Amino acid sequence: MIDKQKQKLNMKVQWAKFAVVLALYLLFLVWVESWLGLIVVPFIFDVYITKKIHWQWWKDEEGPVRFIMSWVDALVFALVAVYFINLFFFQNYVIPSSSLEKSLLTGDYLFVSKVSYGPRIPETPLTMPLTQHTMPLVNVKSYIEWPHWDYRRVKGLGNVKLNDIVVFNYPAGDTLVNEERYQANDYYQMVYSIGDQLMQQNGQEKDVRAMSPLQQRHYFEQVYATGRNYISSMPGEYGDIISRPTDRRENYVKRCVGLPGQTLQIKNRIVYLNGKANKEPDNVQYTYKMKLKGEFPIDLADELGITNEDLLMYNQSGVIPLTKKAYLVLKANRKLVESISINTDATYGDLYPLNAYTGWTRDNYGPVWIPKKGESIALTLKNLPVYERCIKVYEGNDLKVDNAGRIFINGKQAKSYTFKLDYYWMMGDNRHNSADSRYWGFVPEDHIVGKPIFIWWSHSPDHPGFSGIRWNRLFTFVGNIK
């Protein structure tokens, strides 16, 4: 009698557990708008109620089988849980470089929310948890490209706002060489740079400034083909040319300084949107030419937030990235500083678009209109280099220009184009030391990963061990860093 009562009570508990799990799972399916997941419901029912499948058969075994399978069971459960949490809710991200200093610092560990902008349904769902694209140690792909799902984003708490700090997939990371030494390099910049050098050596270099847009296009196509053919012919040096799907490209973090539909222009380092100056971040940095009368004191460097990387740049090139506060302190220190002035060196090379001469520099750039979903733009040979990558690569169209300068999209002559996606303009706060949209262009909406919420850990690479912990940054909300 007692056993029957216990059994009956146990079934009530199991039914209650099943009801809770089923309710949560159905709410999840409603959120992601995918009823394909209903095929899992019978298995959930079996786990709690019918128990036809002996899910934990290994518990009946003895010896090493039981021991090994208990660890396998725990590991598989943990990996699956991490996979879904990272995919739909949040993930960890560590700041690898100084491009956002002094707002976010190298060694800051971020809690990145996926629900802020809405998580993406994975493009490549079959991937090893806790990896981005490569298995550690064995150096092979950590994902399978089939099945491949089209871009779709689940409804989130909001949209990307102006001046948000955003984590996204590197747009120019669709193509790269698989030799490890060069994987961090921008493939397209590398191709154009090599092509330009080879054409100089062969006496084929020309002054593009005097060319028409069509002549420029033909010339840069030749530069690109020369560089790509050279890389392809040197597999021992560069390895194979490979591609990566959107969600397997490297994660970057920058500040959004331009929204879809806005016209962006940089004039004397200040970002203007639709003709109005956008507020600079409080800790924005620029590089300064500096001449010292002696060695830079370490305690002063720590006080001003100047890192070993900053000092190394100064020792190698005579320029150093500084916030306005640090600049004013050093300018007033006549005993240490002989001269200091902002670095206004014009840098024309490697700026986006790579296949046209614009005369733009990192401090004086544009204007460019940022594409907005559903809005159209008239296409000309002059503006085509700015929007060609959006049309061809990000939105999957076939685009060609004939010898008469006529533009064809998917085989039909086109004088305008209507965009299918929203795009953003991302820049680092370390303005003279950041690879950002000025170098590789727009960030499509399908590349947006998430929004950093707070810094859960921070450790300076300049100070080993306990002394490197930045206690004042722990659990700092990123939204409070303006």
Locate each region found by the language model.
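Extended hydrophobic leader/signal-anchor segments used for secretion and membrane insertion
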Residues: 1-482
